[in-house]
C-alpha cells in the first residue's frame, strides 16, 4: 500500500488536533472561574401553553402563575411564567447540599 505526502500530512494534522483537544479540555476537578452574575440576568421564562389577549391593559386569560407577554401594540400575546433565580444564591453554598443528593439507586436494573 502506497502512502503519499498528502495522506501523511492529513494523519499528522489529525493526531495534532486530537492531542490538542485532549490536553486543553477541562478536566473533572479542575478549578473553573466563577463569573459574578447580576440577579436580574438569572431568570427562567417558560411557556404556559396558552395564548392571551390584552384588552385595556389587562389580561385575565393566563393562569395564576403566568403573565401575558405581547409585542408592542399587538393585543395578542402568549402566557409565560417568569422565575428569578438571582435571589436564591449558589446552591453549593447551602450546608445541606449533601442531603439533597440521591442516597439510593434511582433506577432499577433489569432482571433477567
Curated annotation (Swiss-Prot):
GO molecular function: C-X-C chemokine binding
Region named Disordered: 89-112
Annotated signal sequence range: 1-23
Keywords: Disulfide bond, Glycoprotein, Secreted, Signal
A GO-annotated cellular component: extracellular region
Coiled coil: none
Disulphide-bonded residues: 48-66, 52-68, 62-79
Protein name (Swiss-Prot/TrEMBL): Evasin P1095
